Amino acid sequence: MVQGGGLLGRCLQSVELPAGWLVQCGGGWEGWSPRDWEPRLQGWKVHVSATPECAVETLARTTRVCVEFGVSFKFLPTLAGLTEASSKNQARGAAGKFITIYPDDDGQLGELLSVLAGVLRGQEGPYILSDLRYVPDAPVFVRYGAFLGMQMPDVDDELVESIVDPRDMRLVPDHRDPRVVIPDGVEVPEFLRPAYEASQQSCVSRLDDFVSIKPLSFSNAGGVYRAELPDGEVRILREARPHAGLDGRNRCALQRQLVEEEVLRDLVGVKGVQQLRGVFTAWEHRYLEVDYIPGVTLASWRVQNIHLQESDPVEYARQAVAIVDQLIVIVEAIHRRGWAFGDLHPGNVLVSDDGTVTMLDLEDASRVDSPREPGVRVFQYCADKSADAVQADWFAVARCIMMLYFADFEIEAVSPAFWDRCRHRVREVYGERAAEQLISVEGRYGVGVRPVTASDVTVGVPSRRLSVDSGIAGLLSGIEWSRQFGPDGAFPGYITQMAAGVHEVITTGRAGVVLAQQRIGVVPADGDVDALRKTAKQWPGQEAPGLLNGLAGVALTLSEVDAQRDDAQRDAVAAAGRALESAVGRRRLDLAAGQAGVILAALEVAKTVGDSGLMDRAVAAYRR
């Protein structure tokens, strides 16, 4: 196999495709199957996980077994795909799956598992939370689920993956939760009984010492919990899953936690840093036990005090300056101990009710004299590569300060002069102390340092305030400019642009632009109106009928086109009627995408166009 495309794009498959086998690619996966393979609808399927370090070898060994058995399988073909599958923000119910194998029957499943357990013994990979682990010393997992894509609408009319209930042949959701779920009516084969029983067992650990444990947040790296001891003392438990929760440097949660433990031990006694109280392992997950600090994040503090910021900017600035004073002192103390914080942003700064500041989450810290390698970051607070680790911390502190006063500072990524404008406004609105504090921090990193999100294409800041008219003109010009990046002459509005008509609807497409133009007195382009008419006529019956995400919104937009466009208004009536018909079969009742929005759109179209028939149908739908 050719291996190229850079490190992340490197092909992980080192085995040649056998004669008589087919390859299919889609959704980030590469599938290999015998030419005569006849897939089942559902059954027990095998998942294999891997770390980036052993992925090539794990895939090669698994491929040889699958070819020997003549069994179909799919895999993530690149290191980038594998890293994403095990990343910190990946859905926990699906994370970690590197290879999926589709046995022909349970007999083959048992033989396959036995062989894989042997050839993959000692290989490493994250635990797949949705699955049974076949043996403890190999990354081989099993889950009952769909082999072929079958979908059914959920309570919000969103299509979800499904399987057939073997008891009554009805479609039921194919649950992919971060826990083992055996569908009703499915028997666990005898050779999977030990794995199933092991999944139901608990182990004695430090966790048993706490009278209550409440989750505060979850990620694929592990959870963060509030835990109370019998004497009433409260701790925070930070969980780390081995080989899971990869960051931009391919470090797993456990590797980052080991760094954080080292940092916290070095920072014992530093005021303003969350203190370490212990470390323990429960089952295969490792926990840091740290002090519980009541309070809110710096970002939340800012939101909670917006009323004060608007009503009394002087008092707001006094409190903000006091918070920043503490933040500066804490960062200086961390640097004196030889560490750079790393992932410094408002979410990792805690403010207590009395204004005391505490810094949290040092898993991305590094030695001040080591090369800077960003791992997990909130990018608008992250300096570009020109900054060293210490300078990057001060760059982030400056952005934390500016966030307290002007949260839209992030525009600096495309307009460097906007930062200067914000600094000037800090002095003008919040006083000398706030401005000098910011300027002092800015002096601690290089003049040319920019955010990592900075664009090569930059725009200036208007020398005077925009009028409403000039602002609207600028927006319209920018919207028109963006058309070059949209499909079929539409406007880019949704990152995937996958669903039918998504680039034509109100929320994410052309209808939203045309509707806004009409309501401010700008005549939309004939080409856009004609495109919406075409969309209305060709809208697939199975697609969303909703006001903001579907056909009803297109109809509403067409109804407001200049009355001289009778063709558009006729199409609006027809589209609103079809949206009503489609909505009857939907479960959702909300305004955005449900029956309420469709009915209101139909009423508005009927009123605007003067169509009594549509009005009667809309009223009848409302009464239902």
Where are these regions (language model features)?
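ATP-binding glycine-rich loop module of kinase domains
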Residues: 41-52, 214, 220-260
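C-lobe/activation-segment region of protein kinase-like
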Residues: 364-432
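ATP-binding glycine-rich phosphate-binding loop
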Residues: 11-30, 190-230
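Structural motif at the C-terminus of the N-lobe alphaC helix and the adjacent alphaC-beta4 loop
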Residues: 262-272
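Catalytic-loop of the protein kinase fold
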Residues: 335-346, 351
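Conserved short submotifs of the Hanks-type protein kinase catalytic core
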Residues: 284-297
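Juxta-kinase regulatory segment immediately upstream of eukaryotic protein kinase catalytic domains
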Residues: 1-7, 155-214
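Short beta-strand micro-motifs within the conserved protein kinase catalytic domain, predominantly
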Residues: 275-286
